[in-house]
């Protein structure tokens, strides 16, 4: 599938009608997918959604039962991985334990019998780019997890790949290291401009790093777009729910931070400019107030249905409301994403063929 607005003359990767089955399990269900040149595209989805199978199909590690893969206009569907011009980084990178960081990064260049001076200059530059200049003489077991993944990326980039494929490269690292590496990866991409496809199940990682996000589910692409597009204008309930916490207000999905909380119905409908907005207001009971740095999570129960839901408000608003367990409050959705059930934002490539509102958790 190709999202509207993508110029087909500037496409690095095209996957067309890819179908892959393992026994009774359909991993890819006639997927169409394109990656613009120089972009960083994230494949996001739950386990079993097909994201890793799609990446491995691009890499040549898996063969589609039907369909084609082209890289910069060259059909590589039956071309082995080592001849596709790709760099690949796995979650658990297999470094050469007996080689130093420098020699690990240089390995691919030595195999290609590049001149020694070229290898030295290339490795020096890459170690500087990935922030490992001071670690070039160390061995992999002397590096922290984040440093090993930086080494892995430098090694993948050393051979000047046309495409860089990353299969959950930070998935085995702790949360703080992952957060730091996300910012680093974005800076690295902006510097080297290699067309990159990143597989992740981490919504924050995809939203933070990617130029475009493809959300997969059950072997299909549900939506492709910029982080802003998929978050603010999700195609369907699955995309919205997968990209963050949701509650249901008046039968529509809303984000917790789009729920206004007030002590009175009037406070719940008051707009920022002081005017009143006519919309449904729901009464709820406060179950718990959890401080999360700048924001505060308010866990609530609908007075109408007894269903639990969550609102996310600023710390300042929470202090002004002075919420406590058991308090009665009034809530209202300030924004509702325009979800259209069954709609799609990825048209296929041409081929044949006034009452009290009720709230529940989603």
UniProtKB/Swiss-Prot annotation:
Could you tell me which residue ranges the ABC transporter domain spans?
Answer: 13-243
EC class, as a word, reads translocase
A GO molecular function assigned to this protein is: ATP binding
InterPro entries the record matches: AAA+_ATPase, ABC_SmlMolc_Importer, ABC_transporter-like_ATP-bd, ABC_transporter-like_CS, Mo/tungstate-bd_C_term_dom, P-loop_NTPase, Sulph_transpt1, TOBE-like
Provide the topology term for how it sits in the membrane.
Peripheral membrane protein
Name one cellular component (GO) term. ATP-binding cassette (ABC) transporter complex
Q: Which domain of life is it from?
A: Bacteria
Name the catalysed reactions. Answer: sulfate(out) + ATP + H2O = sulfate(in) + ADP + phosphate + H(+); thiosulfate(out) + ATP + H2O = thiosulfate(in) + ADP + phosphate + H(+)
What residues form the membrane-spanning segments? none
- Major place of localization? membrane
Q: Subcellular localization, per the record? A: Cell membrane
Which positions does UniProt annotate for ATP binding? 45-52
Q: Would I find Membrane among this entry's keywords?
A: yes
* UniProt keyword annotations, A-Z: ATP-binding, Cell membrane, Membrane, Nucleotide-binding, Sulfate transport, Translocase, Transport
Question: Sorted alphabetically, which SMART domains does this protein's record hold?
Answer: AAA
Record-stated family: Belongs to the ABC transporter superfamily. Sulfate/tungstate importer (TC 3.A.1.6) family.
Assembly, in brief, is: The complex is composed of two ATP-binding proteins (CysA), two transmembrane proteins (CysT and CysW) and a solute-binding protein (CysP).
Q: Which PANTHER family match?
A: SPERMIDINE/PUTRESCINE IMPORT ATP-BINDING PROTEIN POTA (PTHR42781), SPERMIDINE_PUTRESCINE IMPORT ATP-BINDING PROTEIN POTA (PTHR42781:SF4)
Q: What function is annotated for this protein?
A: Part of the ABC transporter complex CysAWTP involved in sulfate/thiosulfate import. Responsible for energy coupling to the transport system.
Descriptive protein name: Sulfate/thiosulfate import ATP-binding protein CysA
User: From what organism does this protein derive?
Assistant: Mycolicibacterium paratuberculosis (strain ATCC BAA-968 / K-10)
């Amino acid at each position: 599938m190709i999202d509207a607005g993508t110029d087909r003359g500037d496409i690095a990767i095209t996957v067309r009608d890819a179908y892959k089955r393992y026994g009774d399990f359909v991993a890819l269900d006639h997927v169409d997918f394109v990656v613009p040149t120089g972009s960083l595209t994230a494949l996001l989805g739950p386990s079993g959604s097909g994201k890793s199978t799609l990446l491995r199909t691009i890499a040549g590690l898996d063969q589609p039962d039907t369909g084609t893969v082209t890289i910069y206009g060259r059909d590589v569907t039956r071309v082995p991985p080592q001849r596709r011009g790709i760099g690949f980084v796995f979650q658990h990178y297999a470094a050469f334990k007996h080689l130093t960081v420098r020699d690990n990064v240089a390995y691919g260049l030595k195999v290609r019998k590049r001149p020694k001076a070229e290898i030295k200059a290339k490795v020096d530059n890459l170690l500087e780019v990935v922030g490992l200049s001071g670690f070039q003489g160390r061995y992999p077991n002397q590096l922290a997890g984040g440093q090993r993944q930086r080494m892995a990326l430098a090694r993948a980039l050393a051979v000047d790949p046309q495409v860089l494929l990353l299969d959950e490269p930070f998935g085995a690292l702790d949360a703080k290291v992952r957060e730091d590496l996300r910012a680093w990866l974005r800076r690295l991409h902006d510097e080297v401009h290699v067309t990159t496809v990143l597989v992740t199940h981490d919504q924050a990682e995809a939203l933070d790093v990617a130029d475009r996000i493809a959300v997969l589910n059950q072997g299909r692409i549900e939506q492709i777009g910029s982080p802003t597009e998929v978050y603010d204008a999700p195609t369907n309930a699955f995309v919205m729910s997968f990209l963050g916490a949701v509650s249901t207000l008046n039968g529509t999905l809303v984000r917790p931070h789009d729920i206004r909380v007030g002590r009175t119905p009037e406070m719940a409908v008051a707009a920022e400019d002081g005017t009143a907005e006519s919309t449904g207001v729901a009464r709820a009971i406060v179950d718990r107030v959890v401080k999360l740095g700048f924001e505060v999570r308010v866990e609530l129960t609908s007075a109408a249905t007894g269903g639990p839901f969550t609102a996310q408000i600023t710390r300042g608003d929470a202090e002004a409301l002075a919420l406590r367990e058991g308090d009665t409050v009034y809530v209202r959705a300030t924004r509702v994403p325009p979800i259209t059930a069954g709609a799609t934002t990825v048209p296929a490539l041409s081929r044949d063929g006034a009452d009290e509102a009720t709230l529940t958790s989603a």
